[in-house]
Amino acid sequence: MEGRYIVYKTNKVVRRVNFDEILYVESDGRQIKLETECGTLSYYEKISAIAPSFDDSFCRAMSYCYINLSKVRLMSGGIVNFGCGKTLVLGRDSFLRVKREYYNYLRRSIQS
């Protein structure tokens, strides 16, 4: 993931956000919200424009949300817990799908 990034651009700021800084990405109407350990960054973009650049550590949780599996520490009871203490609540079907993807991601990481 090193060297891969998303360009965050607003009227006042242009910033590079590395993939390893991102916990999850979600779409809220016309805005993209990048949730990082330091806070939330919002800007206007379509999630379909940035999703193809994600590597295999990102998992599609819902049509409007992608989770960085490398930042997940625990998944339990419909809640995704990240290493920094932040959480994300998912519906039952989405949680089960992401939990399965997370398990497969961990197995691939061990084998590498």
Located regions from the model:
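Basic, polyanion-interacting recognition surfaces, primarily
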Residues: 1-112
